A protein has these predicted regions:
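Collagen triple-helix signature
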Residues: 1-190
Length: 190
C-alpha cells in the first residue's frame, strides 16, 4: 500500500514545524511457487526440470518502505535426471525498506537430480538492508540462512549469501547459496 501523507507543519514562530513522516510502504507480495517437473516416460526417460519460483514483489515507498516479498520456493522434479527449479529472487525494498529474502531451492528426489539454487537477495532501499541470500537445495541438512547486513548511516550492507547443502541423492549436486542483496544508499535531504 502507498505511504500515508505527511502531517502539516505547525504555523507561526521563527521556524515552522516540520511535516509528519509518511506512512510505511506496504510489503511486496511473495513470489509464486515453481511447478513440479513431469515424470519420465514409463519410468525410463529423464524427468522434466522443475520451474523457477516467482520473483517477490517490490516493497512500497513511504516514510519507511515495506519489505520486499520473499521469492517463491522451487518444487521438486518427479523422476530421474530432472533438475530442480531455482528459488525466485527476493523483491527490492522501498525507500528505507529491506530487500526480501531469496526463495529456497528444492531437494532432488531421485538419482542424478540436481538440487535447486537459492534465489538472490533483494536490494535494499534508501538506507535499507540488503536481503539475505536464499538457502541452497537440501540434502540431509539445509544450508544456513545468510546473515543480514548492518545499517550504518552510510547505508545498509548487503546480506550474506546462503550456504549450499550437500545432496544425499546419488549424483545430485548441492544447491548454490543465493547472492546477498546490495545495501541501499543514504537518501538525499528533502
Amino acid at each position: 500500500g502507498a505511504g500515508g501523507a505527511g502531517g502539516k507543519g505547525g504555523d507561526g514562530g521563527a521556524q515552522a514545524g516540520d511535516g509528519g513522516a509518511g506512512g510505511a510502504g506496504g510489503k511486496g507480495g511473495n513470489g509464486g511457487n515453481g511447478a513440479t517437473g513431469a515424470t519420465g516416460l514409463n519410468g525410463l526417460g529423464a524427468g522434466a526440470d522443475g520451474t523457477d519460483g516467482g520473483k517477490g514483489g517490490n516493497g512500497g515507498a513511504g516514510g519507511g518502505g515495506g519489505a520486499g516479498g520473499q521469492g517463491g520456493k522451487a518444487l521438486a522434479a518427479t523422476h530421474q535426471d530432472g533438475s530442480m527449479g531455482a528459488g525466485g529472487a527476493g523483491g527490492n525494498g522501498g525507500a528505507g525498506g529491506m530487500g526480501g529474502d531469496g526463495g529456497n531451492g528444492a531437494k532432488g528426489t531421485f538419482d542424478n537430480g540436481g538440487d535447486g539454487v537459492g534465489g538472490n537477495g533483494g536490494n535494499g532501499g534508501s538506507r535499507g538492508i540488503g536481503g539475505a541470500g536464499g538457502i541452497g537445495g537440501a540434502g540431509s541438512t539445509a544450508g544456513a540462512d545468510g546473515a543480514r547486513g548492518a545499517t550504518p548511516t552510510s547505508g545498509g550492507n548487503g546480506g550474506t549469501g546462503g550456504n549450499g547443502a550437500n545432496a544425499t541423492v546419488a549424483g545430485g549436486a548441492g544447491g548454490a547459496g543465493g547472492k546477498g542483496g546490495n545495501g541501499g544508499l543514504v537518501g538525499n535531504g528533502g
